[in-house]
Amino acid sequence: MSATASTATQPKPLEWLNRLRANPRIPLIVAGSAAVAIVVAMVLWAKTPDYRTLFSNLSDQDGGAIVAQLTQMNIPYRFANGSGAIEVPADKVHELRLRLAQQGLPKGGAVGFELLDQEKFGISQFSEQVNYQRALEGELARTIETLGPVKSARVHLAMPKPSLFVREQKSPSASVTVTLEPGRALDEGQISAVVHLVSSAVAGLPPGNVTLVDQSGHLLTQSNTSGRDLNDAQLKFANDVESRIQRRIEAILSPIVGNGNVHAQVTAQLDFANKEQTEEHYSPNGDASKATLRSRQLNISEQVGAGYPGGVPGALSNQPAPPNEAPIATPPTNQQNAQNTPQTSTSTNSNSAGPRSTQRNETSNYEVDRTIRHTKMNVGDIERLSVAVVVNYKTLADGKPLPLTADQMKQIEDLTREAMGFSDKRGDTLNVVNSPFSAVDNTGGELPFWQQQSFIDQLLAAGRWLLVLVVAWILWRKAVRPQLTRRVEEAKAAQEQAQVRQETEEAVEVRLSKDEQLQQRRANQRLGAEVMSQRIREMSDNDPRVVALVIRQWMSNDHE
């Protein structure tokens, strides 16, 4: 009575559990279904593509247009948590960027020259000018955004109205605001590049009227940008000169001491001053054959009439005047060269005895030998070189280091002097040292393959499938296989029981079959006798003659 009451009050979950235990097929089906579901889920998870960012920081208009295009192209996408960036499968990122760029996406917050394609007929000149200014601002912003550290940019142009009066003309100005990537900054060269980019894109805009500000409100442009640019160029040029001399020294010494057994460092002092020199030289006409006559003037005056005797008494006044000579035999004074004073020759032929007098004046002007030389000095001339060279010990056959001899060091020093262009006039210095090198691990610059990102990605992809196989093996070992083993054992036991039952039944049937066969034979015999007697009765009733003949035959057979 109590057992019946306890069975009646047993809760339903326990009843279901007892039913499951009583029927071994149900746990097997449940375990198999769970294993298949887990394996399918793991396979789908392993096949899930790796998503990468396609675009980020998009406006709502660009984001909607890109999502519509991705849906039309049947490309799966998702939105990153928090940032709202659009992510697509990693193997399709570059292809989608090119395909979307072909369609003009994303357009960005600023509009470019495509704004001019939408102008309507009859637009006013003011609206046309405003649209052009907006388009120019948008194009400049897009160009600035192509720089690596720049996340976004905005450009504002102040274009004054043109005026016919020079005093009223004003230069345009520009203001540029850039939003930089986290942890990035613009160096001085990039700032100067942005300033000159905007200045060159707008007619009449000087670089000094361009203001560049970052997202924190820091002014990036300064008035002395040209000096900074020049310093950067000077530093780069100095590094190039030093590197070129260093390569020369190492290239000429490496065949002697071996690759990696020589190191050189060069310090070059360069003169970047802009120097120009103008010289003007004057030289006298020392060679009469090379003198060049510029002009000659000859004046002769003659007077005829009575006159009084004149001149110095004596034989000297009766002699003729000496011939005129060019003043090229004797160098002229500096004052004469500077003023180019003509030389005058005067002769007077007077005869105290006659009434006739003649006066002759001849002036000859010669070109002055003048030389003007204008020399512009090279910028970046080498003023002084300082070179330090370290040569490794040579290694013997047994691996022991051996220092170089004095003759070998002298030879290396001479070769280094020739390679560097050593000059005592400049005050160059050279120091060559022979010292053993320490062992250096040259593989430190490159990460091992197991630390490279590509190997890590491949390892993660393989780990997914390995995890799927491990989970499937665990499910097979812990859930499916025991149920199958139990099922096989139960089926085998049932089969053995059925076989024993069948053998028992066959033995019983064998024992029963003998009695049944005897009884059946007897019953058949009785049935046959009854059938024969019935047929004999029918034959005797129907044809008594035949019956009489048969009986007579039987009787005759008995007598015989």
Curated annotation (Swiss-Prot):
Compartments where located: Cell inner membrane; Bacterial flagellum basal body
Gene Ontology biological process terms, A to Z: bacterial-type flagellum-dependent cell motility
Compositionally biased spans, kind Low complexity: 331-353
Major place of residence: membrane
Biased composition (Polar residues): 354-366
Disulfide bridge positions per record: none
Region (Disordered): 304-372
UniProt entry keywords in alphabetical sequence: Bacterial flagellum, Cell inner membrane, Cell membrane, Membrane, Transmembrane, Transmembrane helix
Domain of life the protein comes from: Bacteria
Membrane topology listed for this record: Multi-pass membrane protein
GO cellular component, one term: bacterial-type flagellum basal body, MS ring
Induction: Inhibited in nutrient-poor medium.
Entry GO MF terms: cytoskeletal motor activity
Residue ranges of the TM segments: 26-46, 455-475
Record-stated family: Belongs to the FliF family.
Assembly mode: The basal body constitutes a major portion of the flagellar organelle and consists of four rings (L,P,S, and M) mounted on a central rod. The M ring is integral to the inner membrane of the cell and may be connected to the flagellar rod via the S ring. The S (supramembrane ring) lies just distal to the M ring. The L and P rings lie in the outer membrane and the periplasmic space, respectively.
Described purpose of this protein according to its UniProt entry: The M ring may be actively involved in energy transduction.
Protein name: Flagellar M-ring protein
Gene expressing this chain: fliF
